[in-house]
Every structure is written in structure tokens, then in C-alpha cells.
Amino acid sequence: MTSKLDQLKKFTTVVADTGDFGAIKSLEPEDATTNPSLLLKAASDVNNAQMLADAFSGAKGDIGLACDRFAVAIGQEILKVVPGRVSTEVDARLSFDTNALIERSERLIGLYDAAGIKRDRVLIKLAATWEGIRAAEKLEKDGIQTNLTLLFSFAQAIACAEAGVFLISPFVGRIYDWYKKSSGTDYVGAEDPGVQSVTRIYNYYKANDFKTVVMGASFRNLNQIEQLAGCDRLTISTDLLKKLAEDTGTLERKLAPGNAGEARQSLTESQFRWASNEDAMATEKLAEGIRQFARDQEKLEALLSAKA
């Protein structure tokens, strides 16, 4: 019998949301994504102790650079076991500074360049703030492809498409979490607000021939993944990937080009900020996500500082 994971791979590019090389190798995803939380977990693994030490020793006391070196080292190892791309995230504390985001992105891609990794195998992850989207627009023009993350609203999706970013990561599970907590309702299937958000974005992009890739992220259960089967890409935790690999039930494609979508829109900065302000869920989850990634970045810096 064919597993649901293998069925999913027929119409969706499967991406592993982890820094665990062993798990990636066994599950055979096309790509992999990392973030500060996953890097912190990897840094705490004794098997990566030498990698952490090397990152610090090569940074000459610059802890920020040491963190970037470690992120790229993890990315290099991941690229040994996936045929596609790895996403490496910029320090979340820079999320509201366009120039700083560009500079840090250029440093990350420079480290990959120095390691002999081709740019078409790396995506630089930026939070989908207005400043992050503007940074991504410039980076894309300079040949550095981006993954806009912490995406919770249709306004963010509109702005990312207009900026010509390579890929967006709408967060299914965190949207679901907010609405479940707010309403007390345990949403299932097509009624899940996170599923509805990604479906709307996917249909809008396809209807208007945007080339930006839609990669659903942050899943809480298998049903959310199944409801988005057919999405360009889905980045999935190893636990859920294993469950998909063990399930031999039938998986039907839910998303496909050709479905009805809304007319093309564009947003000025003030319109973007107003739309964000009016969306309580998106405002709260974006701020929360940036804070969480910033705290984990600080913990990673503390681990590296301890080696001084």
C-alpha cells in the first residue's frame, strides 16, 4: 500500500521542518527549513558540539557572526541529505529594519558562497513585516531568493506577491491556535481558519499568475495537511511526516490551479499597516512569533558566549 506521504509527494513538494539530519535522511523530503527555535535545539544536541565550537572559533568574538556561522553549518549538513533547498533565517530582532535585514541576508548568503553552496539551494527567511517584504524585494533583484515567514494575513500575502518574493510560509497551526483559543471551537477540515487562509492565498496567487511559491507551515495535525494537499509546498515536522509515512489511507488532492480566486490587488504601506491593524489575529501572532524567535536567538547567543 502507498503511504499518504508518498501520495502527497505526487502533487506537493514535501519539506522537512527540522534540523535533525537523521530524520531528514530517513523521510526523504525535497527541502528543509530551519528557524531560531530549531537551531537552538540543534545547538543543544551533543552531536553538534564540534560544529558549535567551530562556529564560535571562526567568528573572532562576534557572537552574531557565530550564530550565522552555526546556522550555515547546519544548512550545509542538511543540504547533504536533501536534493533541494534549505531555508536559513535572519535574526528576528532585525524584523523592522530593512537595511539591517539586507545586510544580514547578504552575510548569510556570503557564508554559503564561501562554503561552495550555490545560491539556488538556499532561501533566506525573513519575517513578513513591511520592512521584511521591502528587504526581500531588493534581495530578489540581487539574485538572493527569499522565504517570507510568520505570514498570517491576506495583506501580507498580497504584499509579498507584489514584491516578487520567491516563497511565502503561511502559518496554518498558529492561525488555528488563535481562533480556537478565541472562540473555544475545535475547527476541523475545511472549517479550520488556518486551512482557509492558505487556500485563499493559493487560489489568489494561481488566479493572478503570481510565481511566488505557497508553502503551508506550522501544522498541528494530519487533517490540516490533508486539507492542503496540492499546495505548492508544505513544510512539516518530523513527527507528522512519520505519521503520514505510516498511514496507508487514501489522500485526495484538495488544492489545484484553476480554482476561483480573487482579482489582483495592491497595497500601499499605509493600506498594509491598516489592514494589519484591523486583523487582531495576524497582529498578535506576528508579534508573538518575532518575540519567540528573538528569545531563542538570544538563548543561542548565550550558548555560544559560554564558549568564550
Curated annotation (Swiss-Prot):
The keyword Transferase applies. Homodimer. This is Transaldolase. It is found in: Cytoplasm. Transaldolase is important for the balance of metabolites in the pentose-phosphate pathway. Belongs to the transaldolase family. Type 1 subfamily. The active site is at residue 125.
